[in-house]
């Protein structure tokens, strides 16, 4: 059986929705967006019979996707994406960026699913010469 499903975490965000548009042009795969809509929006939804949008958290990826046999790959863009908010909502930031990302990584490893991960520019800094300046960069 052909693995014909691509999952995009953060598919309702700017980067995720643009990736969905590109994948619709370049592939014949079905696409599933998993987004908690903390910064993504339904206005970014791409209308296509090949795209399905799910509201959920990356930390629950194993519960959400129980049938993995047709999943080809996961593009992981679903993270807490606002540096200034990471100070106000540190627990949400850690929950999404650390726990959620770990869940996605382990899900892919356990199920032999390709992972494409895009780290945040906030992880780039002063070449390690100073401490991380926000919880977002951890």
Regions found by a protein language model. Name each.
Residues 1-138:
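N-terminal Rossmann-like NAD(P)+-binding domain of SDR-like oxidoreductases, especially those catalyzing
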